[in-house]
Amino acid sequence: MRLVFAGTPAVALPSLRALLDSPRHQVVAVVTRPDRPAGRGRHQRSSPVRELADERGLEVLAPARASDPDFLARLGEIAPDCCPVVAYGALLPRPALDIPKHGWVNLHFSLLPAYRGAAPVQRAVLAGEDMTGASVFEIEPALDSGPVYGVLTERIRPTDTSGDLLDRLAVAGARLLEAVMDGIEDGTLQARPQPSDGVSLAPKLTVEDVRVDWSAPAAAVDRLVRAATPAPGAWTTFRDRRVKLGPVRPAPAGHPPLPSGRLAAPERGLVLVGTATTPVVLDEVRPEGKAPMPAADWIRGLRPGTDEAFA
């Protein structure tokens, strides 16, 4: 099939590469979000998908809005058979959805209808799920509600960050998306409606969502930190300054409890923080305006008092 691939961040690259290398399909163009300012210099930066498309000599469409008449006209001229999508990052209006013969087919990183929305992996880690997966479905105007062509499952490991899990799903999902493209071309694959029960939403994590509540149990603190890694990053405050947190882990067995948020002086190189249950070990921090550093080095420089705590 002649394909127009839509995607923006690095998580879309395994799928784009798989389709570019497929002997059965031809990616004739990509759709991605426009270049945007990034970094300290605020220089314009292309999306990872655009960078790969430029390397391969593909036509790039980067409309500010998918309803842009010039974009719709060009897409109509290309007349793709299908438009596979991975993390494009914008809603697609009905006029765009109607152009490809076989529609727009999206790789979504959850077992639909669970975790519809922008942050399915982060929300699954935050909720303490032990299993998730990916679904390939036909896009409809409603959010992530279209009929499903295929799914895969993936176990969530106890130490998985959202980044770890998303990396695995992106690779496995690329194989699934390619198989779905094959099945659509063969006419052997039928999309099935999503169940009406089990629907849940996965909105993007806000800055306030990832502020650590030290009065929560240690397991909840651990899930929050892992869910927010690598972005937006879990955080707390100390002496009225924001501190981003690296990974946490359970304190050694038998360690006495600490008041919620209380910092214990480094003990055998370990920085301990109190929660509602057992303390957690904090390995790395990123103080406001500074680079990441070992938590033990940071706390030695601050020398917190016995009554000081994260807030």
From Swiss-Prot:
InterPro entries: Fmt (IPR005794), Formyl_trans_C (IPR005793), Formyl_transf_N (IPR002376), Formyl_transf_N_sf (IPR036477), Formyl_transferase-like_C_sf (IPR011034), Met-tRNA-FMT_C (IPR044135), Met-tRNA-FMT_N (IPR041711). It comes from the Bacteria. It comes from Parafrankia sp. (strain EAN1pec). Signal peptide: none annotated. This is Methionyl-tRNA formyltransferase. The gene is fmt. One of its GO terms (cellular component) is cytosol. CDD domains: FMT_core_Met-tRNA-FMT_N, Met_tRNA_FMT_C. It catalyses: L-methionyl-tRNA(fMet) + (6R)-10-formyltetrahydrofolate = N-formyl-L-methionyl-tRNA(fMet) + (6S)-5,6,7,8-tetrahydrofolate + H(+).
